[in-house]
Structure formats: structure tokens, C-alpha cells
Amino acid sequence: MATFKDACFHYRKITKLNRELLRIGANSVWIPVSSNKIKGWCIECCQLTELTFCHGCSLAHVCQWCIQNKRCFLDNEPHLLKLRTFESPITKEKLQCIIDLYNLLFPINPGIINRFKKIVNQRKCRNEFEQSWYNQLLFPITLNAAVFKFHSREVYVFGLYEGSSSCINLPYRIVNCIDLYDRLLLDQINFERMSSLPASLQSVYANKYFKLSRLPSMKLKQIYYSDFSKQNLINKCKIKSRIVLRNLTEFTWDSQISLHYDVINNREKILTALSTSSLKRFETHDLNLGRIKADIFELGHHCKPNFISSNHWQPASNVSQCRWCNVKYVFRNMDWKMESMYNELLSFIQACYKSNVNVGNCSSIENAYPLVKDMIWHSITKYIDQTIEKLFNVMNPVEVDGQQVISFHWQIDVALYIHIKMILKTETLPFALTLYQFGSIIKGIVNQWYDVTELDYLPLCTEQTDKLVKLEEEGKISEEYELLISDSEDDDQ
């Protein structure tokens, strides 16, 4: 087990390039970090162990030892993890780059074998080759990869992933790309590698190679917002941001293939890039469709629909002295936009409900309460129209000129009044609302705060480092909004 980790340890002194590339956290002094009880393969050292969340992408793919290096497969520094990473589509040329990288960093020849024979402190006869002493030589070249599926984008991290584990909580799946290359050609490459090994190790090498190279591919798993860590989320002014650490270098390459070309033919450039790289901290916004769905589900769960039959004049989120309407604690760590949407939705529905239904106070039990929760849950789904129609029908609509309408004459605040006029594109609000107008107002309130058609599915921490740098230069990496604060001096003028 952990052949990749052992190979990184023993091969790191072979060349100057190896000294820089093969320094992994698993072979360094252990610095304790919290464990998340997620068992899987660390994609940096390839050992099967308990994982923790990465500083660069907030996904659980790094072990408690390698986390100290703060490396991510989305960095643009050409470290070993980055060199083993390719984005889809996977071509034969990209797979050849992986094979050439393995042969460069982990060669097997008589000179290497003799070097390890001198280094290894054997306790038996020098002529014997124990597997435990020469595990680093039992490194077969396989084309297995841990695949992260970010909706339409797939990222492959190639490595020697040994053993088996349940992948239920893992953000990636292990796939075998041998059929995209050439099965017989890969067999020949490994036969040539093992030809220099002693006979006692050849059988072990061959057994390990065929076992790993013939593994069936797992079905890819779509990454969702629930897969990301919440440990690096910060809440400033009721805006959620995510702290992301990435390794940067000033050197650029046109493609990952050109980077691998320099690893083989221009090692000085790679060494310079590694020695001049730096760790940069990004504070990215966390506004994405996955988080919005999670927040809306939580909001619908904690929603107090009793507010629509109450006589409270303040916004729904500010009610604190009523046992039936108090939700103030829910918004302690929730986005300010979610709170504003909740206030406007419930204020509008309260005005409609009080205008049409003879209801006493917020302690009464009404048939509309479950529909209010459903409306919040379905506010960004395709079922919103059905829910709006059901809610409209419980408000005792009457037929006027062949159309079902409800009365609308209850008091509302000025901000909501102006917003409804903008949605309906009218100068004065009508005293009766049709189903279309009722639905348009609800959708308009939701879309004002969250236009789901323009949101990304996943957080920005899944983007490549180059894109984060570009977004930061353009001022689009953080969520910006205006605070409408009146200046007392300007007001007096």
C-alpha cells in the first residue's frame, strides 16, 4: 500500500527536479489537523486514509499530512499534483504526458536498483529483495484517475490509487483511462520497466500492475454544494464569502501539454517557477445556485407562515415577541438578500390574505400556511406556478369580467409599494389582482434578489487559479452591493 508515497520519498534525491517535485506532506513532519471521518484516497500522496478539506477548493481530497503543503489540483504552480491534473476531454496525447512524467520521475533501471540496494538497510542477506524494502520499485504505470465532475466540466487527477474503499462521501470517483490509450502498449511499457527488476520483485510488480490496470471505472459523481466545506466561510455584513488559498507562479503555459513539454525539455524553467511561486489568499463570493437552494430549503423549514394572518406592522424577520411569528434567530448567519426576500414575500402575501380572508390573528390555523412554505421551497423551481395558483385559490377569488381576481387593499410599506409598481409597470397599484399579476409579483420579488438564470451551479473555488486572478483584477471576485445610507449633511443642504 502507499507505493506512490514511498516512491516520492525514495526517488526525491535522484535529481534536482525530483527534490522539488516529490516533496509531499505525507513524508514530512506531521502537523495535527482535524479529521472529518471521510475515508478515501489523498490525491497528493495517493494513500488510503482519512481525508480533510482542501484550502484551495474546499473539497475533501487531502490527507492530514499533505494538508500542510496547502496544495490544490487547481493551482497554477507546476507542482507534482498540478502536473498529474488534466481537464476533459482526455486524449491519447495527454495520457502520454502522464506516462512520460512517471518515467521521468520514477525510472527503473540497473543504476537505480543498485543505488537503492546501497541505501536500504537490510537485516538479511544482501542478495534477498524483500517487498517491504523495495516498495518504491514496485511502481507500475497505470492510467487510473480521480475524477471531479463540476457539472459540464471534468477534472482528472492521475495517480496510483491502491486498495478499495466506499466512495459515498468522496467528491470524486476513480476511473480507468486505459481504453483511451492502448492496452497492449501500456502493457509493453510496464514489461520494459519490470525487466530490470530481480525475479522476486517482477512477480509482485506484474501482479500489482494487472490488478490496478484492469480496474473497472466507477460511475462519475456530480459535485453538489453539500460536498464543500463550511469551515472557510466567513460572514461579513450578512454576506457570505469563502477564503481560498492558491499557489501562484508568474510563468504561464498555453496548455497543460506545453507545461509537460517543459518538464521534459526545459527543466530550469520549471525549477524557477517552483522556487518563485507564492501562496495567495482569495476572498471569493459564495453566491451560487447550490447555496441558494440550500438557504431556501432552510428558510422554508424555519418559515413562520402565521405572519400572513397577523397584524404585525414590522418586517417578518424582525418580529421577536410573538411565539407564532418569531424567526429572528434564523437570520443570524443567513444572507441579507434572503432576509429581504423573505420580508417582501410575506408582507405581500399578508396584504393579500388580510384583504380577502376574514382572519383574526397569527395564532389561528389556516389552510394557506403549508402553501406559504411550499411557495418558498419552490420559489426557484419549475413547480412555482402550481404553488402560486394553489395559494391564490385559498384567498377566495371572485370572478370579474371572466377573470378570477382577489382584493388588494391592505397596507404595505413604501419600499414594497415601489417594487410592486416596478414589477407591474404601472403608476398606481390596482385594488384587485389577477392570478397573472399575483404570480408576477411573487416571481419579481424572488428574481430581484436571486436571478437563478445567471448564477453558477457551484462556488468560485472550483475555478482554475488563472480565472480567479482575472476576476480579482476585474473586481468581480467578491459580491458587491450598495448600502443606501443617507448623509445627514447632504440632507440638510
Swiss-Prot record:
Residue span of region Zinc-binding domain: 42-79
Chief localisation class: host cell
GO (cellular component) term, any one: host cell cytoplasm
Keywords of this entry: Host cytoplasm, Host cytoskeleton, Host-virus interaction, Inhibition of host innate immune response by virus, Inhibition of host IRF3 by virus, Inhibition of host IRF7 by virus, Inhibition of host RLR pathway by virus, Interferon antiviral system evasion, Metal-binding, RNA-binding, Viral immunoevasion
Residue ranges of the region described as Interaction with host IRF3: 318-493
InterPro entries referenced in this protein's UniProt entry, alphabetically: Rotavirus_NSP1 (IPR002148)
MF terms in GO: metal ion binding; RNA binding
GO BP of this protein: symbiont-mediated suppression of host cytoplasmic pattern recognition receptor signaling pathway via inhibition of IRF3 activity; symbiont-mediated suppression of host cytoplasmic pattern recognition receptor signaling pathway via inhibition of IRF7 activity
Region ranges (RNA-binding): 1-81
Function (record text): Plays a role in the inhibition of host innate immunity by inducing the degradation of key host factors required to activate interferon production such as IRF3, IRF5 or IRF7. Associates with components of cullin RING ligases (CRLs) including CUL1 or CUL3, which are essential multisubunit ubiquitination complexes, to modulate their activities.
Name of the protein: Non-structural protein 1
